Regions:
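Solvent-exposed strand-to-loop "edge" motifs in beta-rich extracellular domains
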Residues: 4, 355-361, 396-398
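Aromatic-lined carbohydrate-binding surfaces of glycoside hydrolases
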Residues: 1-115, 142-151
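Substrate-binding cleft of secreted/luminal carbohydrate-active enzymes
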Residues: 158-291
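Glycan-recognition and processing domains
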Residues: 268-343, 372, 426
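Substrate-binding cleft/loops of secretory-pathway carbohydrate-active enzymes
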Residues: 92-199
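Short, surface-exposed beta-strand/strand-loop-strand elements in extracellular ectodomains
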Residues: 362-374
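Extracellular carbohydrate recognition and processing domains
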Residues: 373-403
Length: 439
């Protein structure tokens, strides 16, 4: 719920007001009757790298006059019965900010000490009480560990608004994200909103042509869209707002089918073999993984390849979007470990889908454990087109006998080097995974 913005002025790229507020803009969410109660106003910093630059003036939402009336409103909302309606699927708990979403990130927006923190906690507790048994549909817009700990204690989820900056929050344990010593991006499935099925969302937006000032050439937006959508799935998000359906309709359709899936009911597991050196992790952050893991070790050490340059991102300047074997140094394999809860033992009926760059004339094969000798080989001979292609292999005899991060199967280069971008395992028939996250 938005209720903080008192004034919304349009400005130029230098922050000068060019179209002052008339007091009736849709962004001006604060009730006009507050003018009679002396609520202090806060003029925020102008946002000038937006498609349409603006400057917001907010109410001081933690001032006693505002705060007391805000809590009364939320209690009345709870008594109205509206939260119990089936139509209410998710609800954002907005704060205040200089940006257009009342999303907050500064200490003034989301205080974590003193009287401000006490009032912030009162806001959260009042929302939880108003929604009662449906409090799990509430989403704080904060990513601060202290705020999230309080939300999780109350049974409230979380929503970010900026997954298009797809390498944000790489190392935020409160959101289940970490980067290990080898650079692999990890996910903690026991993070409360993931484990307990709270609303757990994000927004993937800012893809119109007016956003080139922030993100660079429009022709690069398709890459950013794809990376962002896959990052949302890596984070186990179960809610996603998108503002474009035409950049990659097939990917959007896939994401819609995947959102909210757990290890128990997901039809597939996948690994995107990407790597990006960032300012925070200059040696590189590896892979987006969803229950399928790739790891380097002796005989299976890989090289990041297929570079895509980024025009304007404040975290990094390029992405590697594939990994290859390194036959010249005796590294002929790319090894994969499937989450034991997804499939273990066997034999199982599965589909392997391997997306690769058809560069040069290498030959590679998919090697897996099968109980019967003589199974037809899963072999690919590249033809040098330079295209991105996907090889699909249907198999009904696959055993996944390894445990943990030991390899269940591998891509093996027979001639030259295999350049692999994305590997997906689809289980056929009834789901046979172990115990996953509660629904």
């Amino acid at each position: 719920m938005r209720a903080a913005v008192w004034r919304f002025d349009q400005v130029d790229r230098e922050g000068k007001v060019i179209r002052p507020s008339r007091g009736n803009a849709p962004q001006e969410s604060a009730p006009r009757w507050l003018a009679d109660h002396g609520v202090p106003l806060i003029k925020e910093k102008a946002i000038t790298n937006n498609a349409s630059p603006f400057q917001i003036t907010n109410c001081d939402i933690f001032h006693p006059i505002y705060h007391e009336r805000y809590l009364r409103f939320i209690r009345a909302l709870g008594r109205s019965g509206i939260p119990a309606l089936d139509a209410v699927k998710v609800a954002y708990l907005c704060d205040k900010s200089a940006t257009n979403g009342e999303e907050g990130w500064t200490e003034a927006d989301q205080p974590t000490s003193g009287e401000g923190w006490q009032r912030y906690r009162e806001r959260l507790a009042t929302w939880a009480e108003a929604f009662g048994p449906k409090r799990h549909v509430l989403m704080t817009v904060s990513s601060k560990p202290q705020v999230l700990a309080e939300c999780y204690r109350l049974g409230i989820g979380q929503r970010n608004g900026f997954v298009e900056m797809y390498l944000g929050h790489l190392d935020n344990a409160a959101m289940g994200q970490a980067v290990d010593a080898d650079g692999y991006l990890l996910i903690d499935d026991q993070c409360p909103p993931i484990a307990n099925g709270y609303a757990w969302g994000d927004e993937n937006e800012e893809y119109g042509r007016g956003w080139t000032a922030r993100f660079g050439p429009y022709e690069t937006f398709g890459h950013r869209y794809r990376e962002s959508m896959l990052r949302a799935l890596q984070m186990r998000r179960n809610y996603l707002l998108v503002d474009r359906s035409d950049l990659d309709p097939a990917l959007l359709h896939y994401v819609c089918l995947e959102l909210g899936r757990t290890i128990d009911d997901t039809p597939d597991a996948w690994c995107y073999l990407r790597e990006t050196p960032t300012r925070q992790f200059p040696k590189g952050v590896r892979n987006f993984e969803r229950w399928l893991h790739q790891r380097d070790r002796a005989g299976a050490r890989t090289v990041a390849v297929d570079r895509y340059d980024i025009a304007k991102q404040n975290t990094h300047s390029f992405d590697f979007t594939a990994r290859r074997t390194d036959a010249a140094t005796g590294q002929y394999k790319i090894g994969f470990a499937l989450d034991d809860r997804f499939l273990s033992g066997g034999p199982h009926r599965v589909v392997f889908k391997v997306t690769y760059r058809d560069e040069g004339r290498p030959i590679w094969r998919l090697a897996y454990d099968a109980p019967r000798a003589g199974s037809s080989p899963c072999r690919v001979e590249c033809t040098g087109t330079g295209e991105i292609r996907t090889a699909t292999f249907f198999r009904d005899d696959v055993r996944f006998g390894a445990t943990g991060l030991d390899f269940d199967f591998a891509i093996e280069a027979e001639r030259g080097d295999a350049m692999i971008k994305f590997v997906r395992v689809i289980r056929l028939g009834a789901a046979t995974g172990g115990q996953g996250s509660p629904k």
